[in-house]
């Protein structure tokens, strides 16, 4: 304790009272008035009596906390001091002065205490800072060790494969263990209403806002309630899904949101909750969110022709769609992201099988096969038949996956530019690697109009016409925009063709003028040398 405790040690003064030695003890924080009162009480004098202290050689001693200490052998003598009678005014002044002096004394004592407390706090803060630095270092070490373990695990599980390219990125699969920090946006009634319609403008929203919209859909459809989904786990899962979509021009997280929002709007538009079980709705929504996870931006044709790791792994059978499924269930396998944690094992098996079936159905190579099967069932469609329902769910996710042209033109058309950009990136790479190039992906052969007309005419319209037979409401809301979109691109193609024809004529006239002039000069010379017969 040392110096810290010595400052609080009381002071002892010895008084000689009629030959009797009286010891008086007081703290250094007492003021002069308190000490004088204490001496008066010790000598039997009335309080407030003015007294003086004398040493053994009759020298006067100042009565205050700093007065010199003495011993039993050298006690101070106490002498009352005779004072004149003072007026009431003087007594009042003296009282006020005494109070002021006492306040000053207290103020000085408070300042001293403040200084001591401040010094003590400074010492504690320094200690906390040092301890905090230790914690930071420990956490950094833990993080480094965790990264090293993950890298070692990835290396141990990696198979040596003679593939040309690998698109896997296992680092993304590690979910965030803390509660996701993206802001929880409070959706306005107008946004909630618009979110249920196919006309929703998906370009107006930032990623955090799209995450909040997806979270709202699960609550609004009753999925969080019916399957006891932990809201924090739902947010963490959505954030992990977001992190596992790549920044491709087309196949990115916004496309994921676009497809899921269209599925959500079809649930409300077609009254699907009356036709399907809640588990079916959960499968439809979750498959839509996961259907393009970790898409590398190069389609199945490229994967197969380039003999990539995905093509080899899945034996050229829907390599991308199989990869999307695998990533989806790797994320769900993490306890922190398992939104199906409360679902019984048999229920989870059904959900898993349903999601795999729907995601694999998005492979456009299977389009004709799925459409033919669905048309067969349409003749006697039975909602109680599980096979019929499965085919309908496959058609629904296919509709949502390629539904951009269902939206208003100002929302749909930018997606065409995004898709063509991704196509051109692939065709450029295929040319550089000596691989086959599809004409509809070649930047030298395709235009926006030619890319869309055939797709709308032979894929989109027939598929949505089939769905309209089950849900007539689809015709006005979804089929009519497709007809209008087809007309728009046909007009655009006519304009493109007219411009090309005009360009050809201009080039022909420009390149043919010198030749025609030469021929005319030659004819004139010939006519001069050969006169026509009479």
UniProtKB/Swiss-Prot annotation:
It holds the Pfam family PDEase_I. Zn(2+) binds at residues 255, 291-292, 401. It catalyses: 3',5'-cyclic GMP + H2O = GMP + H(+). GO terms for cellular component: cytosol; endoplasmic reticulum; Golgi apparatus; nucleoplasm; perikaryon; perinuclear region of cytoplasm; ruffle membrane; sarcolemma. Binds 1 Zn(2+) ion per subunit. Binds 2 divalent metal cations per subunit: site 1 preferentially binds zinc, while site 2 has a preference for magnesium. Tightly binds zinc. Keywords: Cell membrane, Cell projection, cGMP, Cytoplasm, Endoplasmic reticulum, Golgi apparatus, Hydrolase, Magnesium, Membrane, Metal-binding, Phosphoprotein, Zinc. Residues 517-534 have a biased composition (Basic and acidic residues). Pathway: Purine metabolism; 3',5'-cyclic GMP degradation; GMP from 3',5'-cyclic GMP: step 1/1. One of its GO terms (biological process) is positive regulation of long-term synaptic potentiation. Mg(2+) binds at residue 292. The keyword Transmembrane does not apply. Its cofactor is Zn(2+); Mg(2+). Residues 175-496 form the PDEase domain. Disruption phenotype: Mice hearts develop less dilation and dysfunction when exposed to sustained pressure overload. SUPFAM superfamilies: HD-domain/PDEase-like (SSF109604). InterPro entries: HD/PDEase_dom, PDEase, PDEase_catalytic_dom, PDEase_catalytic_dom_sf, PDEase_CS. Highly expressed in kidney. Lower levels in liver, lung and brain. Widely expressed in brain, with highest expression in cerebellar Purkinje cells. Present in heart (at protein level). Inhibited by SCH 51866 and moderately, by zaprinast. Specifically inhibited by PF-04447943 (6-[(3S,4S)-4-methyl-1-(pyrimidin-2-ylmethyl)pyrrolidin-3-yl]-1-(tetrahydro-2H-pyran-4-yl)-1,5-dihydro-4H-pyrazolo[3,4-d]pyrimidin-4-one). One of its GO terms (molecular function) is 3',5'-cyclic-GMP phosphodiesterase activity. It is found in: Cell projection, Ruffle membrane; Cytoplasm, Perinuclear region; Golgi apparatus; Endoplasmic reticulum. Signal peptide: none annotated. It comes from the Eukaryota. Homodimer. Specifically hydrolyzes the second messenger cGMP, which is a key regulator of many important physiological processes. Highly specific: compared to other members of the cyclic nucleotide phosphodiesterase family, has the highest affinity and selectivity for cGMP. Specifically regulates natriuretic-peptide-dependent cGMP signaling in heart, acting as a regulator of cardiac hypertrophy in myocytes and muscle. Does not regulate nitric oxide-dependent cGMP in heart. This is High affinity cGMP-specific 3',5'-cyclic phosphodiesterase 9A. It comes from Mus musculus (Mouse). The lineage of its organism: Eukaryota, Metazoa, Chordata, Craniata, Vertebrata.
């Amino acid at each position: 304790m040392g110096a810290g405790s010595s400052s609080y040690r009381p002071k002892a003064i010895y008084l000689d009272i009629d030959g009797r030695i009286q010891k008086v003890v007081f703290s250094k924080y007492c003021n002069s008035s308190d000490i004088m009162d204490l001496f008066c009480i010790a000598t039997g004098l009335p309080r407030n009596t003015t007294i003086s202290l004398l040493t053994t050689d009759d020298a006067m001693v100042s009565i205050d906390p700093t007065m010199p200490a003495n011993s039993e052998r050298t006690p101070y003598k106490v002498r009352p001091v005779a004072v004149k009678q003072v007026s009431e005014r003087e007594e009042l002044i003296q009282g006020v002065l005494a109070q002021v002096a006492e306040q000053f004394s207290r103020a000085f004592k408070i300042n001293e205490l403040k200084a001591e407390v401040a010094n003590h706090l400074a010492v504690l803060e320094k200690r906390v800072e040092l301890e905090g630095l230790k914690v930071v270092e420990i956490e950094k070490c833990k993080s480094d060790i965790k990264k090293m373990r993950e890298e070692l695990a990835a290396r141990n599980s990696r198979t040596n494969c003679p593939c040309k390219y690998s698109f896997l990125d296992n680092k993304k699969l590690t979910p965030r263990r803390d509660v996701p920090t993206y802001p929880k946006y409070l959706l306005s009634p107008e946004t909630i209403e618009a979110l249920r319609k196919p006309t929703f403008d998906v370009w107006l929203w930032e990623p955090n806002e799209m995450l909040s919209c997806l979270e709202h859909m699960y609550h609004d459809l009753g999925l969080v309630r019916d399957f006891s989904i932990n809201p924090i786990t739902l947010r963490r899962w959505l954030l992990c899904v977001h992190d596992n979509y790549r920044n491709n021009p087309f196949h990115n997280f916004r496309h994921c949101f676009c497809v899921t929002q269209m599925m959500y709007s079809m649930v409300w538009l077609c009254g699907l909750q009356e036709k399907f079980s809640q588990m079916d709705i959960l499968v439809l929504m979750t498959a839509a969110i996961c259907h393009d996870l970790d898409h590398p931006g190069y389609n199945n044709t490229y994967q197969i022709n380039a003999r990539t790791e995905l093509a080899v792994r899945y034996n050229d059978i829907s390599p991308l769609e199989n990869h999307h499924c695998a990533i989806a269930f790797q994320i769900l396998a993490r306890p922190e992201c398992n939104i199906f944690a409360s679902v019984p094992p048999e229920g989870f098996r059904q959900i898993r099988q349903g999601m795999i079936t729907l995601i694999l159905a998005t492979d456009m190579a299977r389009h004709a096969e799925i459409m033919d099967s669905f048309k067969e069932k349409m003749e006697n469609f039975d909602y109680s038949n599980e096979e019929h329902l499965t085919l309908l769910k496959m058609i629904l996710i296919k509709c949502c996956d390629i539904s951009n042209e269902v939206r208003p033109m100002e929302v749909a058309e930018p997606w065409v530019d995004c898709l063509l950009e991704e196509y051109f990136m692939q065709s450029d790479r295929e040319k550089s690697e000596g691989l086959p190039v599809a004409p509809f992906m070649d930047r030298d052969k395709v235009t926006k109009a030619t890319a869309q007309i055939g797709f709308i005419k032979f894929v989109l319209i027939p598929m949505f016409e089939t769905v309209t037979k089950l849900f007539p409401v689809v015709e006005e809301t979804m089929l009519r925009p497709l007809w209008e979109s087809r007309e728009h691109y046909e007009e655009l193609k006519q304009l493109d063709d007219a411009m090309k024809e005009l360009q050809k004529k201009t080039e022909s006239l420009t390149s043919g003028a010198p030749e025609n002039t030469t021929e005319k000069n030659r004819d004139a010379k010939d006519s001069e040398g050969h006169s026509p017969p009479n």
